[in-house]
Amino acid sequence: MNETFIPASDYKKKNWCLIDCKDQKLGRIAVVISRLLSGKQKLHYHPAFDVGDYVVVINAQDMIFDSQQPRFSVNVPGRPGRLLKQVINALPSQLLMTAIYGMLPEGSAKKSLPKRLKIYNGPDHPHAAQNPIKLDEFI
């Protein structure tokens, strides 16, 4: 019977990563963030264990969206005369969160992984005490 060696100390370490979304495309950023949240970039990745990192995203309002496909959100669903508003101009952080959530793997971890994601529209964030690592080379 084969037994997999699992180093317990490596699974408990969670790094804080900082990603600047200024002048970056939505899909490219979402792929990088989903890989960081699930921990697939680590050498000791295992799908049964939670080995992902915390991710802080800044400048979400300055992302580049696909302008050819306007995205709308229904404000009052199921009623005649419902209001449609463009999601791109109103809620850039919500659009990023939806894209990342769709790229996460299916299963019970899909609900817990977005809890480690912090999205801010401006350049300021309250997580300076965690010393996040700025990731520019992955994007």
Curated annotation (Swiss-Prot):
Concerning NCBIfam families, the annotation shows:
rplM_bact (TIGR01066)
Choose any GO biological process term that the UniProt entry carries and state it. Answer: translation
Family, per entry: Belongs to the universal ribosomal protein uL13 family.
Query: Which locations, inside or outside the cell, does it occupy?
Result: Plastid, Chloroplast
GO MF entries: mRNA binding; structural constituent of ribosome
Q: Which PROSITE patterns match?
A: RIBOSOMAL_L13
> Which InterPro entries does this entry report, sorted A to Z?
Ribosomal_uL13, Ribosomal_uL13_bac-type, Ribosomal_uL13_CS, Ribosomal_uL13_sf
Q: Does the keyword Ribonucleoprotein apply?
A: yes
* Name the UniProt record assigns to this protein: Large ribosomal subunit protein uL13c
Q: How does it assemble?
A: Part of the 50S ribosomal subunit.
GO cellular component terms, alphabetically, are: chloroplast; mitochondrial large ribosomal subunit
Against CDD domains, the record matches this protein to:
Ribosomal_L13
- Domain of life, per UniProt, equals Eukaryota
What's in the keyword line of the UniProt record?
Chloroplast, Plastid, Ribonucleoprotein, Ribosomal protein
